[in-house]
């Protein structure tokens, strides 16, 4: 049975999450709150919230866990060509934390295959915006001719980045933001991005699954490192692909 957490109740050990043969593998607990303090504690333990509007807050720690190592980021020939164009063309920008809440709302509105509605409700936007205001959550945004056309957001502690969601209004705009994030993380020797659950899209970009035990061990060590700066522009794409000669 999945435990219900009161406001002062701690998370159970992640090993108690429901197993692969259950109807909800990885489900660890449920609660009625999404307080910033609860969110911070969750991420530092390798736990994340995911639920539908009208449900209680559901907390997850799946096994295996989908991750992307910045060193293993895959750049297709077409994306490489796009990134070179972005580097040359002043109409393209990468902005960091320009409008965090707007990125979340755009992610909420993005259509997802096989998914109705969104879990990114107004309450979720406010909870993550609280983390953003204290420097624990960030948005990486792709802009073209002064308009935001893609981006992503996630949570960062120490040398660990926890990806949450992304959106694109033009082709490859979310991949541009991800490439910029990967370039920034490479510069700061960050070894892992949490991607939560396996998708073919993430796998095509170099994501892979690892055992939860290994993931949790990495998180525990990484979140205690000093925080990295979150100020960069599209020149971080040079970490991914050199501009055309």
UniProtKB/Swiss-Prot annotation:
The keyword Electron transport does not apply. GO terms for cellular component: cytoplasm. Disulfide bonds: none annotated. Keywords: Acyltransferase, Cytoplasm, Transferase. GO terms for biological process: protein catabolic process. The keyword Cytoplasm applies. It comes from the Bacteria. It is found in: Cytoplasm. One of its GO terms (molecular function) is leucyl-tRNA--protein transferase activity. It catalyses: N-terminal L-lysyl-[protein] + L-leucyl-tRNA(Leu) = N-terminal L-leucyl-L-lysyl-[protein] + tRNA(Leu) + H(+); N-terminal L-arginyl-[protein] + L-leucyl-tRNA(Leu) = N-terminal L-leucyl-L-arginyl-[protein] + tRNA(Leu) + H(+); L-phenylalanyl-tRNA(Phe) + an N-terminal L-alpha-aminoacyl-[protein] = an N-terminal L-phenylalanyl-L-alpha-aminoacyl-[protein] + tRNA(Phe). InterPro entries: Acyl_CoA_acyltransferase, Leu/Phe-tRNA_Trfase, Leu/Phe-tRNA_Trfase_C, Leu/Phe-tRNA_Trfase_N. Its EC number is 2.3.2.6. SUPFAM superfamilies: Acyl-CoA N-acyltransferases (Nat). Pfam families: Leu_Phe_trans (PF03588). Belongs to the L/F-transferase family. PANTHER family: LEUCYL/PHENYLALANYL-TRNA--PROTEIN TRANSFERASE, LEUCYL_PHENYLALANYL-TRNA--PROTEIN TRANSFERASE. Functions in the N-end rule pathway of protein degradation where it conjugates Leu, Phe and, less efficiently, Met from aminoacyl-tRNAs to the N-termini of proteins containing an N-terminal arginine or lysine. This is Leucyl/phenylalanyl-tRNA--protein transferase. It comes from Paraburkholderia xenovorans (strain LB400). The lineage of its organism: Bacteria, Pseudomonadati, Pseudomonadota, Betaproteobacteria, Burkholderiales.
